[in-house]
Regions:
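Basic, flexible Lys/Arg- and Gly-enriched helix-loop patches that mediate nucleic-acid binding at interfaces
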Residues: 1-154
Length: 154
């Protein structure tokens, strides 16, 4: 990813949060260290929404467990929201979380006996990947930067 934006600006830039190698989607890259801290520190609880493709249908019971909370090795995690993406394909779910713990979405589903086939972050702190082809990037507009600095988005 950093190779794609290598010449975006003269300052040092770095990713805000992380996506593992097998995850696609929204990744904010900045040269503003204060903003990066604000967006990644758990106390600021920035919303992340993922589209998750799983190896089998997710049961209603497991959907409820995820909503209520699941105990993992590093503590409990629960989704702020979870739903099926398509009515006719119960192996695809959308999940909204605020946690920034490493590989949390994958670990959550693996704990319940599922294998994540594909994971795509579709929303982060008010930003989406809408109209942005995979492997491409764009500068934020002034309003988006101001919204992030003011904490206008979860």
């Amino acid at each position: 990813v950093m190779d794609i934006v290598r010449y975006a600006c003269p300052e040092r830039i770095y990713p805000v949060g992380r996506l593992d190698r097998n995850t696609t989607g929204v990744l904010l890259i900045t040269n503003d260290g204060d903003l990066a801290s604000k967006l990644t520190h758990p106390s600021f609880k920035k919303k992340k929404i993922y589209h998750v493709w799983l190896n089998k249908d997710v049961s209603i019971e497991d959907m409820q467990k995820i909503a209520d909370g699941v105990e993992l090795d590093d503590g409990e995690i629960h989704a702020d929201a979870i739903s099926y993406v398509k009515e006719d394909d119960l192996s695809q779910v959308g999940i909204e979380i605020h946690s920034g713990r490493n590989r949390i979405v994958r670990r959550l589903f693996e704990h319940l006996g599922y294998r994540v086939v594909k994971l795509d972050r579709v929303y982060f702190a008010g930003l989406t990947k809408k109209n942005l082809p995979r492997g491409k990037w764009r500068y934020l507009n002034e309003q988006e930067v101001n919204n992030l600095r003011m904490g206008a988005f979860e």
